[in-house]
Every structure is written in C-alpha cells, then in structure tokens.
Amino acid sequence: MSVGLLRILVQNQVVTVEQAEHYYNESQAGKEVLPMLFSDGVISPKSLAALIARVFSYSILDLRHYPRHRVLMGVLTEEQMVEFHCVPVFRRGDKVFFAVSDPTQMPQIQKTVSAAGIAVELVIVEDDQLAGLLDWVGSRSTSLLQELGEGQEEEESHTLYIDNEEAEDGPVPRFIHKTLSDALRSGASDIHFEFYEHNARIRFRVDGQLREVVQPPIAVRGQLASRIKVMSRLDISEKRIPQDGRMQLTFQKGGKPVDFRVSTLPTLFGEKVVMRILNSDAASLNIDQLGFEPFQKKLLLEAIHRPYGMVLVTGPTGSGKTVSLYTCLNILNTESVNIATAEDPAEINLPGINQVNVNDKQGLTFAAALKSFLRQDPDIIMVGEIRDLETADIAIKAAQTGHMVFSTLHTNNAPATLSRMLNMGVAPFNIASSVSLIMAQRLLRRLCSSCKQEVERPSASALKEVGFTDEDLAKDWKLYGAVGCDRCRGQGYKGRAGVYEVMPISEEMQRVIMNNGTEVGILDVAYKEGMVDLRRAGILKIMQGITSLEEVTANTND
C-alpha cells in the first residue's frame, strides 16, 4: 500500500496519523496492508472503492458482472498484474482501462506500457473482487498449457509429429485441436498464430475484429507451426517462403467436417500461421439473412433469373462477396441447369455445382478455366475474380452467348466497377451489352440484442452531416449503442449484417457507358434511378436498430 493512499485515509479521517504510521511500518515489513485494514474493521472494500473514486474522480467497475474472458492478457504479463495489483479489463481505441483498487500504481503501469503506445485509464474496483480476478488470471493457464510448456526446449524436433496415436494424443496436437474448437464456438472467421521474440499469442477474428485469446509458451512456437503444417500437408522443412494449404477436421463423432485454409508466413521470430475457417454449410445461404432491403432483394432476384448476362459483386476482402455469390447460385441450383465455378480456392462446398480450384503454377488460371467451361455445356458460370483483360473478355463473351455469369472485382462502389473494367481495356460496347447488375457491399457488426441500449441522438446538424435527411429526422426511430454482456463476450456486437449498393444497368446507363461516361456520370444516373449507396443503406440499418452510428461511419464513405 502506498504512502499516498494512507495519506488520503488520514485526510478523510478513516485512520489516525498513528494508525497510518503503524500500517506503513507493517508494509515496510513486507505485509499486505489492505487485508489488515479490512480485517481490523477500519474500512470495507466497498467503502474504500467509493472513497477512492470520489477523491480521484474515477468510475467504479463492479467486477461481479464483468465477463472475465474480456481480460486483455497481452497488455501485461501475469507477474506484472500481480506486482501492480491491476488487471487490464477493456480497450477503447488506443486507451486501455486498468482495474485497480489503489490508483497510485498508475505511474508504474504507464511506464510499463508506454513503449507499446498505450494510453492508461483507470477504473476503481473493490479490492476483494480484484483479488478474485487476479486469481482467475493466474489459473487461466490451464493444465493443457502447463503441459504444453513442461520440459520443452525451443527446438523443432519433427519426430513429435509421426502419424500414430501417441503423436495425435500429445499436448501440441491437443492444444491445437482445442484452439480450433474454441474458434468455432466463438464464431471466428480466422485464427492467427503469432510469434515474437519474447512471447507468442493466438488471436481470433470475430465479427471482423481481432482479439487475443491465449498466449502459449514461447518454447513451443516452432512445434505449433510445424504441427499445423503437417495437418495441412505443407512442407515442414521449408521455412523461408510462404506456403498455402488446407485441412479438414471433424470435432465430434458424427459431426460435420470443417474446412480450414492455412497460410504460413516467415517472420523474424518464426512462421506466422493464419487459418481461415471455411463455412461450407449450404443451409446458411439464405438471401433473407443477408441484410438486403426489400427493393434491393427484388432487383437482385430479377437480375439473376435472366437467361443470360453478368452480375458483378464488388467490395474489399472479407466483405461477404463469396457468400452473396453462393446465395445466388444456391437459388439457381436446380436439376435442369449446369453450373461451373472457378475459384482461388473454393470456399463453400455446394452439392450439384462443378467447382474448380485455379492453380496458376500449373497453368489453370481463371481464363483457362473459363475457356474449358465454355466447352462443358454450361448454363451458369461463376469466376472467383476478374483480374485481367483476358478473363474479362472471356467472361463477357460467355454472357453475350447465352450464359449467366457471376464474378467479383475489388472496387469501392458499384459505379467504380465499370471504370475498372474500362481501365482494363474492355470495350464500352461489351460492358453495356453484357453486364446486368453490379452490387457493392460491406459487412457491419450487429448490435447485441441482449444488451444494446438506447442512446441520445446527436444534433440534427450532426446527423445530417452523416447523411440523414429531414424526412429521416422526422420519423419515430431510436438510436442504439453498444454496451457489452456475456452473450456478446463484452463486445456490444454479435453477428454481422450486410449493407448493399445494388445498381442495375438500365438503358440510360448503357447509353452513358457507350459514350465513355465517367464514374461521376454513371453515379448521377444511378442516383436518379433510385440507387441507395452504402452510406444510405447503413443509415437504414441504424434506423432499424440493427447497428450503431459509429459502425456505419467507420465502414462506409459519406
């Protein structure tokens, strides 16, 4: 206990000067003073927390309702948490909030984390609750992690990974299996195994956000990476270049197999491994669950049910383009049609569809696959991505000769897709005569329905600056914000919803394209014809109580 805290107790007449001197001497003798204060009946943990919060103007956090899995394990070591008697409990931007019962520890905390660019904020907690949380942190290294680190030297003995029962039942395989199982339960899309000079960490990407879940012993970093490479049939002896692989695992008897795409990357302190969980469940391909507004859904369904043409989906990596395309294919997947796809790689396994993984090294490019498809009597073709003029020309030829073609590009919005194709060298006539509809999309985090709370609306001028109209402001709707609870693991968000910019290619737009119209000109026609852009689609989601204002402004352009 610090002298500063004893001084505060004296100033607030909780203890006398003589008592303070007594407790100070006890602390100098190595004894814990706060438990003595509590056991002597001088003050209770609750009263002490209230006093400290009032004196220092800090907020109080009740740890009885705090979801412990939110503890930020990568900010301080367990030893530092015990030494400073604090726990990092949550993060807001570059600020990390530390739960403390003695705020005079703040300088030591700041000194420790300043090199990482972390701004320190404190919240006051009752000392007995903090002790309980520290005990939980200490026990968090489960018996599996302890076993994982016991007797391990930092070496890469590949004899550990022979294919027999003893190897499969070892601590490293079991730890990996548990990590992957935890990732599935948490709804993660990606798993990051990262290795640094003095520590290692594993992070899950859930609803688009990365968060740390565990720190395995640094001594086994090579064994973790090698084991994953064996499971995904990669070369464990090659550590100098990136490798890509794939694995399929079943986590319970009779359960569905789960596919993982694996990527390794040589770094300064070992190979980083990222695993993408591939959701191959066709049952999830429900158009009503994707977040389309009713009029957008109608436009899309009209376009995909045409006998021929091209539907293009655009957006950044991780924006849900593959799911949107496969949802369309799932709708069209009947006994009477022949569907072929070329992907890099195929992420969703859909029965009844002929799926091809492209392999540039072997000459099986998107363009080569497309040429072969046209000799396979196809009705519907999907190309994972139009990357070059050759692929674009073949796809357009297919759309012009009686086939329905689906593909993706990486652009910021729907009108920019036409500009991208023109820049590739595609003739304006070919674009105008083949493209039926372009759809841009983003994924926004859904507010957790269990804990979202109504918040006060910003001023009308502030909302208008975001994109709200006078008509919007006159309507009766509530603005909600993120809070955090056990169901959403303290994030305030659970799941994601799509926002879409659906732009059908009308006759007027065809004329603009034929006349080498600019992106601005195309956008002007789209707005006149009633297109809703991504920001507007996000505003509709805010008014429906699905997402927050912060989420929309962070992920869409005004």
Swiss-Prot record:
Sorted keywords for this record are:
ATP-binding, Cytoplasm, Fimbrium biogenesis, Nucleotide-binding, Protein transport, Transport
InterPro entries per record: AAA+_ATPase (IPR003593), ATPase_typ4_pilus-assembl_PilB (IPR013374), P-loop_NTPase (IPR027417), T2SS/T4SS_dom (IPR001482), T2SS_E_N_sf (IPR037257), T2SS_GspE_N (IPR007831)
Look up the domain of life of the source: Bacteria
Query: GO MF annotations for this entry?
Result: ATP binding; ATP hydrolysis activity
**What is one term from the GO cellular component aspect held by the record?**
plasma membrane
What are the subcellular locations of this protein?
Answer: Cytoplasm
Instruction: Return any one Pfam family short name.
Output: T2SSE
For whether the record's keyword set contains Transport, the answer is yes
The record's listing under CDD domains reads: PulE-GspE-like
The record lists ATP as bound by: G315, P316, T317, G318, S319, G320, K321, T322
This chain's function reads:
Involved in the translocation of the type IV pilin.
State the family named in the UniProt similarity comment for this chain. Answer: Belongs to the GSP E family.
What is the name attached to this protein's record? Type IV pilus assembly protein PilF
Gene expressing this chain? pilF
